[in-house]
UniProtKB/Swiss-Prot annotation:
Family: Belongs to the class I-like SAM-binding methyltransferase superfamily. rRNA adenine N(6)-methyltransferase family. RsmA subfamily.
Protein name: Ribosomal RNA small subunit methyltransferase A
GO molecular function annotation: 16S rRNA (adenine(1518)-N(6)/adenine(1519)-N(6))-dimethyltransferase activity; RNA binding
Function: Specifically dimethylates two adjacent adenosines (A1518 and A1519) in the loop of a conserved hairpin near the 3'-end of 16S rRNA in the 30S particle. May play a critical role in biogenesis of 30S subunits.
Disulphide connectivity of cysteines: none
Amino acid sequence: MKEHKARKRFGQNFLQDTRIIGDIVNAVRPQADDVVIEIGPGLAAITEPLAKKLNRLHVVEIDRDIVCRLKTLPFADKLVIHEGDVLQFDFNGISGKKKIVGNLPYNISTPLLFKLAEVADDVADMHFMLQKEVVERMVAAPKSNDYGRLGVMLQYFFDMELLIDVPPESFDPAPKIDSAVVRMIPVKHRIGKADDFDHFAKLVKLAFRQRRKTIRNNLKELADDDDLQAVGISPQDRAEHIAPEKYVALSNYLADKAV
């Protein structure tokens, strides 16, 4: 079969390290009847060992050449191939609690993670290969340099853990950055639930717009000092010092106040 060359516009770096591949599959723990969706199967490094354990495997792939390759594989009868852009894919169109896995293209990782957060209620767990610095931002705790908007928003939906460090030489072509595998499990019992999620998302975005400024300055168009203090936030704090549940509490307080 003709060798497939990685395409930069699709952010393709193909995993080839068999040890890492095995570790990822073991982390996913696929059972025969599981509903599993793989994003960006590429050259089937993870696809093949997953398919061996599953009755059916959904794959989402934008590269037409790779789609053609997938159709010729010995286990192609187990694959349900969805050709297209994963950012436009309807995850709710596949019924059942889903396990989602993939080596995510670095150039669309953040918008894709936010899209997946929208379907968290229908997800069992997710395992993704990502740029390591992105994973560190996802799992970061308050008062750390990596803690920011991405972490707050995703921690609202998921419990997350950095599972596996992946060096550049595990890929072909080798990227110029380190990678990591993250496990994401939907939160079962949230400390607080946002009454108006759009308001909560806007508040968090504004809070981190200028990290060096105080929360008072960043949120001045939404909240005054009394509002902040009402939920236990010091107006002098910076955004990275404030836990996710405090942002939820502030959003709910402001929403109630506006009624």
